[in-house]
From Swiss-Prot:
One of its GO terms (cellular component) is cytosol. GTP binds at residues 232-237, 251-257, 276-279, 341-344. Residues 222-383 form the TrmE-type G domain. Its EC number is 3.6.-.-. It is found in: Cytoplasm. Belongs to the TRAFAC class TrmE-Era-EngA-EngB-Septin-like GTPase superfamily. TrmE GTPase family. Exhibits a very high intrinsic GTPase hydrolysis rate. Involved in the addition of a carboxymethylaminomethyl (cmnm) group at the wobble position (U34) of certain tRNAs, forming tRNA-cmnm(5)s(2)U34. It holds the Pfam family MMR_HSR1. Binds 1 potassium ion per subunit. This is tRNA modification GTPase MnmE. Coiled coil: none annotated. GO terms for biological process: tRNA methylation; tRNA wobble uridine modification. Homodimer. Heterotetramer of two MnmE and two MnmG subunits.
Length: 460
């Protein structure tokens, strides 16, 4: 799990830092020990550090290429921690390509790999891995909430919480391992309840961070919403209403939908993956049975399930009373919203009705009545109206690492309570700490780093 930290390549790298295509301004970024030499070739001198200079840009043969702003940042006071040169010219693609070509005439200057500028910033301790990922998340944000969350992660709010947990685990490990390594000191780590209390406090704090990370993941990646229910409840009509188009075939024949239908939509910029499934029932039809099994596979992977029912058939709102078999199979802690469809036929008022632990919505999918209220509810489920102003963006790998750390804390607690095994507790604490450290990159494999930074755009 742990590897030695790499050092940045000795090559100087160059790339276009702005998006490809036409624009008013285009930026070429150079990073490395030869940035000053590139400046001498392109503009004839090295600009004053952190001073914008309006100068002509020339090729290696002295031919004019463009004119614009040159900025020079001296290591380590730059984004990458290396010498950095930025050439800000006009945004025509041909002009920028010629400018990059001119920089490549300097020996040992090469084109940057995707994400290599951010990678060098990480390797030079200018930011940690979670902050580096937040750069890409900020660029790709599809809503204001996602952008704000990514900025908070970039500013280190997520990393601060992870580092706090790592520090707490470090102190607890020192205490436990001291009792193991120095038995003559007679440190009884069970007698005063310190270990148990610390474990409880750390687990509680980790659970809180996990909850925030899951919310942040929904902002970044979108929420998987599965529409489930019996045949002819109106699931496909609801998919069409949310998607704003006829994505699914709708008929009065029960069992029309036999396979999984997926639509990627945005509600006020918030990404959702809406999944329509086959009606759930016992069936002798082989094709329909396969569709039902696929429906359950989607349900088990969902972030939220819309439990669809025909309001003309029951006045009951409690899903356990309506369909106990469905609720018993539903994954524990699954977010569930009850949808009472066909309000136009049952005469029910359109809107939200709260029932115990499950929000209940009365609507008419075919007439698109009550859809806006449901859309607001889905936005709230993603944290659109979250009262937590400190919401940060997180990725699936972050959640996986937190969950693994949580598992090891629980295992350590069991070893302590069942076996009084201090050595095994210490090992579980070490593993929990290592998984959390993967988030910020303190312990990360080369494969993980390569995968993360390769997903960045070239100039980042």
């Amino acid at each position: 799990m742990t590897v030695e930290q790499n050092t940045p390549d000795q090559d100087t790298i160059v790339a276009q830092a702005t998006a490809s295509g036409r624009g008013g301004v285009g930026i070429v970024r150079v990073s490395g020990s030869l940035a000053a030499k590139v400046a001498e070739q392109i503009i004839g001198h090295v600009p004053l550090i952190r001073n914008a200079q309006y100068v002509p840009f020339k090729s290696n043969t002295g031919e004019p290429l463009d004119q614009g702003i040159a900025l020079f940042f001296k290591a380590p006071h730059s984004f990458t921690g290396e010498d950095v040169l930025e050439l800000q010219g006009h945004g025509g693609q041909v002009v920028l390509d010629m400018l990059i070509k001119a920089t490549l005439h300097v020996p040992n200057v090469r084109l940057a790999r995707p994400g290599e500028f951010s990678e060098r910033a990480y390797l030079n301790d200018k930011l940690d891995l979670a902050q580096a990922e937040a750069i890409a998340d900020l660029i790709d944000a599809s809503s204001e909430q996602a952008a704000r969350g990514a900025l908070r992660s970039l500013q280190g709010e997520f990393s601060t919480q992870i580092n706090s947990l790592v520090e707490l685990l470090t102190h607890l490990r020192i205490y436990v391992e001291a009792a193991i390594d120095f038995p003559d000191e007679e440190i009884d780590f069970l007698s005063d309840g310190k270990v148990q209390n610390d474990l409880k406090a750390i687990t509680k704090q980790l659970s809180s961070v996990k909850s925030q990370a899951r919310q942040g993941s929904l902002l970044r990646e979108g929420m998987r919403v599965v529409i489930a229910g019996r045949p002819n409840a109106g699931k496909s009509s609801l998919l069409n209403a949310l998607a704003g188009r006829d994505a699914a075939i709708v008929t009065a024949i029960a069992g029309t939908t036999r396979d999984v239908l997926k639509e990627h939509i945005h509600i006020d910029g918030m990404p959702l993956h809406i999944i329509d499934t086959a009606g759930l029932r016992d069936s002798s039809d082989e094709v329909e049975r396969i569709g039902i099994e696929r429906a359950w596979q989607e349900i088990e992977q969902a972030d939220r399930v819309l439990f669809m029912l025909d309001s003309t058939e029951t006045h009951e709102n409690d899903p356990y009373k309506i369909w106990p078999e469905f609720m018993r199979r539903l994954p524990k802690n699954m977010g569930l919203t009850v949808i009472r469809n066909k309000a136009d036929l049952s005469g029910e008022n359109v809107g939200k009705v709260q029932y115990d632990d499950y929000p209940v919505f009365q609507l008419s999918a075919s007439h698109k009545q009550g859809i806006e209220v449901l859309a607001e509810h889905l936005k709230e489920c993603m944290g659109f109206h979250s009262s937590n102003e400190g919401q940060f963006i997180a990725r699936r790998r972050h959640i996986d690492a937190i969950e693994r750390a949580e598992e090891h804390l629980l295992l350590g607690k069991q070893q302590l309570e069942d076996n009084l095994a201090g050595e095994l507790l210490a090992e579980e604490l070490r593993l929990a700490q290592a998984y959390l450290s993967e988030i910020t990159g303190e312990f990360s494999s080369d494969d993980l780093l390569g995968k993360i930074f390769s997903s960045f755009c070239i100039g980042k």
